[in-house]
Amino acid sequence: MGAMEIERLMGERAKALMENNPDLEIDRSKEEGDWGLLTLREGGTLVGFEFLETEESIGRPDALLQYFDAANDGYYVGVVVPEEKFDDVTDLIYSMGEGQVTVLTYEDLGITPYTLA
């Protein structure tokens, strides 16, 4: 999944989030390693993050640390992964005793990646 694909997925997800909450402000950032970060603000106040991962980026060494740091600071954290990685990522997060991270799939959100790798 390339940079343009991540950009498209971030755009689709941001649009869906804003349809559900028009007061939400969303900053999109494509990160090195072809993963995306949505920073969510409401009324100028930071409320959470969504990490849009690929099959490859989900294995980056600092991914879990980033999720847990944000969640432990009290922010909503969503991690969006390809359907094939859902069980593995969910098991890993819960095996570490962390329940504040929400794992979602692109497919469940109605966002279809053109490629999943």
Model feature map: region roles:
Residues 1-33:
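Acidic-basic catalytic patches of nuclease active cores, encompassing PD-(D/E)XK
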Residues 24, 75, 99-101:
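A structural micro-motif
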Residues 33-36, 75:
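Short, surface-exposed coil-to-beta transition loops
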Residues 36-65, 70:
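Conserved catalytic cores of phosphodiester-cleaving nucleases, focusing on short active-site segments
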Residues 84-117:
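Domain-level recognition of nuclease-like catalytic cores that cleave nucleotide substrates
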